[in-house]
Amino acid sequence: MFLIKRRDINIMLTNKKVAIIGVGKIGETLLNGIIKNNLVKKENLAGSTAQEAHAQEINKKYGIKTYINNREMILGKDIIILAIKPQMIKKVLSDIKEIISGKQLVISIAAATSTQFIEECLEKNIPVIRAMPNTPALINEGMTVLCPGKYIEENHIRMAIDVFGAIGLVEVIHREELMDVVTALSGSGPAYAYIIIESLTEGGVRMGLPRELAKKLTAQTLSGASKMVLKTGMHPALLKDAVTTPAGVTVDGLMELEDGGIRVALIKAISRATEKSKEISR
């Protein structure tokens, strides 16, 4: 079952206390989004990093409490966000499991790491939500998919939606096995989009356009096309047909794409990436 949520769905997190373990790229993006959208008071926000210098930098930049000790940081917090790499997850969970409680919500961004794995590592009935954002979150245009663990209640999901709604759109799924497909499609998807942008740009350059102009035309065209799909709700095939006139320029270009096997290549990319995600998942 899919619960469709958008970033305009919001409840107040003002009185909640939030700790972000790992203020790296995505962790800092979340922190920035939370602050800009006034979701949580600054005095109720905290972040941790492995290096003292980086902790001081974050403190100075955002005016929040920063730590290098995760155990100290999570005390009294309502929401704990694990914005760390999967190879670090076991060590971090082992460090905090003795002091974490079932009243705290854990949100994990660690790729290929199931809610069950986190629950087992913590050795308690802890509410855990798995989140898969993507890199456009860095400019608040992300796509995040959430999947709740077995101890999650509706209010936990609503809080997670608010947090990730600060950096883009949010969807919720309840079948965790689909997170491997999510990883392959929206998690890895920006890389596929970039190679398409790069290739179309090269095509424009080959035919005489200045490189920067070709890149801008390509990026804006794909951005606009994506927004049309989202805003109109129309099937991409219908939108494609609206651009394709009989005996026109577009149909010849489409024929070359079909001849090159673009559909099959993209479908196979998702299939292979999904299998890879399954291979490394735990």
Predicted segments with their positions:
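Rossmann-like NAD(P)(H) cofactor-binding subdomain of soluble oxidoreductases
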Residues: 52-53, 61-62, 70-146, 150
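Internal alpha-helical scaffold of NAD(P)-dependent oxidoreductase catalytic cores
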Residues: 117-127, 143-181, 194-231
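A short glycine-threonine-serine/GTX helix/turn-capping micro-motif
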Residues: 180-191, 240
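NAD(P)-dependent Rossmann-like dehydrogenase/reductase catalytic/cofactor-binding core
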Residues: 6-8, 12, 219-282
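Small-residue helix-packing motif on alpha-helices
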Residues: 45, 55, 73, 210-217, ...
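NAD(P)+-binding Rossmann beta1-loop-alpha1 motif at the extreme N-terminus of oxidoreductases
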Residues: 7-75, 142, 205-206
